[in-house]
């Protein structure tokens, strides 16, 4: 049997969500329906990525340099955090669809400073309440960190993203 009940779309237009202890911003690209959802207190969302030594935009060559020391634990831990944030019903609702999670990492500490979520207004992720995204943000900031290479330390921040369907 198919559940035909309507789901609330929380993210159809630009909106600020004032929640208990935090504020989220939803920016929707007009005409494209692309949602950018993030904590309003973010430091790096929409900031230009620059080389702190030169003050210039990161070059094409610099884009391909390794910013992190090699490790094997962060990727599965990030995926686990996302999986655990969604209820069984929510996982069923978004089944077969991915959304994008972007981490903005402080190059001085290796800690995650900001987390951004990207999906479409017509995507089932638009029916997921803000509290789920907040849970992901808090858990990532608490449990994920990186060892930054000398090349990574040249940047004003490091951006790392992935697409995921919660399982």
What do the PLM-derived regions correspond to, one by one?
Residues 2-6:
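Sec/Tat signal peptide C-region and signal peptidase I cleavage site
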Residues 7-167:
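Charge-biased low-complexity segments
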């Amino acid at each position: 049997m198919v559940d035909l009940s309507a789901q609330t779309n929380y993210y159809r237009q630009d909106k600020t969500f004032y929640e208990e202890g935090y504020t989220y911003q939803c920016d929707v690209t007009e005409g494209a329906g692309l949602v950018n959802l993030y904590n309003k207190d973010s430091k790096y969302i929409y900031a230009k990525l620059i080389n702190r030594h030169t003050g210039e935009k990161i070059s094409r060559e610099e884009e391909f340099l390794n910013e992190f020391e090699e490790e094997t634990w962060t990727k599965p831990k990030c995926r686990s955090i996302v999986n655990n944030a969604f209820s069984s019903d929510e996982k069923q609702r978004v089944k077969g669809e991915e959304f994008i999670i972007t981490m903005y990492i402080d190059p001085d500490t290796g800690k995650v400073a900001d987390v951004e979520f990207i999906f479409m207004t017509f995507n089932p992720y638009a029916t997921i309440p803000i509290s789920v995204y907040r849970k992901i943000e808090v858990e990532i900031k608490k449990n994920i960190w990186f060892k930054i290479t000398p090349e990574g330390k040249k940047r004003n921040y490091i951006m790392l993203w992935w697409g995921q369907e919660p399982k």
